[in-house]
């Protein structure tokens, strides 16, 4: 029975500052570093040993992966970085303080942008320096693939091909796969795995730095899921 471990990155500096982060590449806070290490300790104590790991191309997820694998003494396992596991892109809200954004646009509008399934925030202009087409880590991609904003629905549409083409095949070859990624890319995956309705996924929160384990059947259907640190 293969296991899939979903690990949201530890608290980032912009999580701490209550800012919309999205694809902006901020690092972990001191608390986030501790959370990542504690996640690795929890997995080790639970006897869970990933054989291959996936992460995004953003340092808060990559560093979370490294720190947790160090505690597991498994930094040697294969590690695949895939941009499709990036956080949801918050468009023109990127970098803004969430409370100040609510004051500017109103609580209801910001709530819709953050919590509706298919309503994205205002998009970044393609010439905006925050747009991913100006970031060298995406230079090999078709610019049309790079979002200027995303809803959770659009996030799922890019995560799903990564799941089907990369992660699901890995689960058929290995007993345990670890994904260190982001709140919304992991929520998109949870929606798919658990078959949740659009409104149901909006109530799901994934905490930072707490490993969520899925035990899967041979056909990768979910048998049960649980947080290791519960």
Curated annotation (Swiss-Prot):
Pathway given in the UniProt record: Carbohydrate degradation; glycolysis; pyruvate from D-glyceraldehyde 3-phosphate: step 3/5
Catalysed reactions, semicolon-separated: (2R)-2-phosphoglycerate = (2R)-3-phosphoglycerate
Active site residues according to the UniProt entry: 9, 87
Assembly and binders: Homodimer.
Marked site: Transition state stabilizer: 182
CDD domains: HP_PGM_like
EC number(s) stated in the UniProt entry for this protein: 5.4.2.11
UniProt xrefs under SMART domains: PGAM (SM00855)
InterPro entries per UniProt: His_Pase_superF_clade-1, His_PPase_superfam, PG/BPGM_mutase_AS, Phosphogly_mut1
Family in the record: Belongs to the phosphoglycerate mutase family. BPG-dependent PGAM subfamily.
Residues annotated as binding substrate: 8-15, 21-22, 60, 87-90, 98, 114-115, 183-184
Keyword Repeat: no
Xref: HAMAP family: PGAM_GpmA
Keywords tagged on the record: Gluconeogenesis, Glycolysis, Isomerase
Protein name as annotated: 2,3-bisphosphoglycerate-dependent phosphoglycerate mutase
Pfam hit, one: His_Phos_1
Compositional bias annotation for Basic and acidic residues: 128-137
Function: Catalyzes the interconversion of 2-phosphoglycerate and 3-phosphoglycerate.
Keyword Metal-binding found: no
EC class of the enzyme, as a word: isomerase
GO biological process: gluconeogenesis; glycolytic process
């Amino acid at each position: 029975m293969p296991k899939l471990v979903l690990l949201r990155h530890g608290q980032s500096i912009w999580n701490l500052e209550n800012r919309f982060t999205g694809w902006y590449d901020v690092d972990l806070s001191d608390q986030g570093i501790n959370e990542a290490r504690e996640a690795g300790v929890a997995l080790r104590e639970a006897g869970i040993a990933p054989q291959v790991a996936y992460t995004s191309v953003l340092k808060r997820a990559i560093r979370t992966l490294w720190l947790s694998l160090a505690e597991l003494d498994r930094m040697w396992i294969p590690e695949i970085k895939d941009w499709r596991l990036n956080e949801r892109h918050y468009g023109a809200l990127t970098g803004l303080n969430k409370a100040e954004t609510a004051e500017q646009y109103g609580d209801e509008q910001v709530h819709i942008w953050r919590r509706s399934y298919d309503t994205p925030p205002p998009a970044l202009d393609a010439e905006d320096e925050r747009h991913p087409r100006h970031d060298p880590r995406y230079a090999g991609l078709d610019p049309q693939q790079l979002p200027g904003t995303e809803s959770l629905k659009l996030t799922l549409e890019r995560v799903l091909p990564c799941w089907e083409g990369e992660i699901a095949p890995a689960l058929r070859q290995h007993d345990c796969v670890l994904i260190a990624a982001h709140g919304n890319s992991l929520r998109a995956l949870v929606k798919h795995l658990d078959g949740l309705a659009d409104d149901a996924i909006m109530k799901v929160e994934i905490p930072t730095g707490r490993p969520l384990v899925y035990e899967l059947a041979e056909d990768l259907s979910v048998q049960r899921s649980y947080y290791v640190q519960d």
